[in-house]
Amino acid sequence: MTASKSTETLPGDNTNTWSGRFDEPVSELVQRYTASVGFDKRLAEYDIQGSLAHARMLAAGGIIGPHDLDAIERGLSQIRQEIQGGGFVWQLALEDVHLNIEKRLTALIGDAGKRLHTARSRNDQVATDIRLYLRASIDRITALIHAMQKALLHLAEQHVDTVMPGFTHLQVAQPIVFGHHLIAYFEMLKRDVERLADCRKRVNKLPLGAAALAGTSYSVDRAMVAQELGFEGVCENSLDAVSDRDFAIEFCAAAALIMTHLSRLSEELILWMSPPFGFIDLADRFCTGSSIMPQKKNPDVPELVRGKTGRVNGHLVALLTLMKAQPLAYNKDNQEDKEPLFDTVDTLTDTLRIYADMMAGIRVKETAMREAAKRGYATATDLADYLTKKGLPFREAHEAVAQAVRFAEKNNRDLSALTLPELQQFSPLIEDDIFTVLTLEGSLNSRNHIGGTAPVQVAAAIRRAREWLSATPAAQ
């Protein structure tokens, strides 16, 4: 939606909808302090959708007349066009998106505009707007996660046989294939998609009809409004309907996990791109240079993903803190829910958009990966397993191999480079067939089970992942 014009017009007379209760107008400072239109105007489209559904329900129930409905529909259509075209004038004095639209509607159609708010409060109105906004955001984000997953699978398919070291404690542990490593992130994002889908179920309930907190004395048809707006049902307690922000907190928690997964991948990209690793190179469009060191190519995008993850985590804590001491029902504190939520959506959306493209621009240095897998005695566990299969208790095999590693390290050689007599001094069970076991390919192929790093299993995992993507819609 195109950004609309913004003004900070502060009329001299008090034009608030609730001014009849007060002897003096709100001060200019308080108006600025309490206004939310600067950020909640992004809810305008959802506010219009909710108002149209509400008006149609009022007309169907005979609460407003058909001529009122026709005028409201025409007026809201014009307002939508003004907002999309950037010609709508937002007034700070009108406080929020709801009153700005209502005042403009009344100016366009007269008394019919004043009847729109019948059987409705801004409390249930804003709760509805946020849920509509978040539902649409979840669908867009889910589609972006799928794009990221496809990028991971595309890269993994190219590297089913590319050997690299697997790490624990950032120390070389065992050989794996690069495709296997990438699928680990696919699985993380798969859980993220499932969490978002589960969160969406709780987002997709209609608060409208709860009014301020106790419901309304009008005979409203909440089911009709829910059906028109695509909600699966209605919030069943009016107090909870207007005060609940669990769904926003739950989304932010899911978003924080997604960002955490991307941050972990970012850390690895940064490490892999550094000269001590030299496993990959990122496309130039995702990097910057140094103002003083001409040789530098800095992985700015992955670094910013790490940094922005802290930002999203902070928004989650902000929302939890916002809600922790509020009595029922609605309180003005809840105005502070929108900026953390909006920024979480924006940050996550931008991160996912850029990440899929960044994965497509990765150049893998296969030789460097393979050479690194040869270092650090990555096949030591295979030697221990070999001895165990020969009948030696695993703990004894572990000790024998540890001594063999010390010997090899002292002589600056890999286990596979030791002679048979040298190996047999640590266990007489070792025979000629050990040298097949100690190769990188031998180690990889021995992990031939679901979830293992054997190339044949990695290829099967990629097929299963593509089947899951095909069966999982991006939008519910």
Curated annotation (Swiss-Prot):
Annotated gene: argH
Subcellular locations according to the entry: Cytoplasm
SUPFAM superfamilies the UniProt entry points to: L-aspartase-like
UniProt keyword Lyase, yes or no: yes
Main subcellular location: cytoplasm
Catalysis: reaction(s): 2-(N(omega)-L-arginino)succinate = fumarate + L-arginine
Single GO molecular function: argininosuccinate lyase activity
Keyword terms of this UniProt record: Amino-acid biosynthesis, Arginine biosynthesis, Cytoplasm, Lyase
Matches recorded under Gene3D superfamilies: Fumarase/aspartase (C-terminal domain), Fumarase/aspartase (Central domain), Fumarase/aspartase (N-terminal domain)
Protein name as it appears in the record: Argininosuccinate lyase
GO BP terms, alphabetized: arginine biosynthetic process via ornithine; L-arginine biosynthetic process
EC code(s) of this entry: 4.3.2.1
Name of the top EC class for this enzyme: lyase
Lineage per the UniProt record: Bacteria, Pseudomonadati, Pseudomonadota, Betaproteobacteria, Nitrosomonadales
UniProt cross-references to InterPro entries, sorted A to Z: Arg_succ_lyase_C, Argininosuccinate_lyase, Fumarase/histidase_N, Fumarate_lyase_CS, Fumarate_lyase_fam, Fumarate_lyase_N, L-Aspartase-like
Sequence similarity: Belongs to the lyase 1 family. Argininosuccinate lyase subfamily.
Membrane-spanning ranges: none
Pathway membership, UniProt: Amino-acid biosynthesis; L-arginine biosynthesis; L-arginine from L-ornithine and carbamoyl phosphate: step 3/3
The UniProt record lists the keyword Amino-acid biosynthesis: yes
Disulfide bonds: none
One cellular component term from this protein's GO annotations in UniProt: cytosol
Database matches in Pfam families: ASL_C2 (PF14698), Lyase_1 (PF00206)
Organism annotation: Nitrosospira multiformis (strain ATCC 25196 / NCIMB 11849 / C 71)
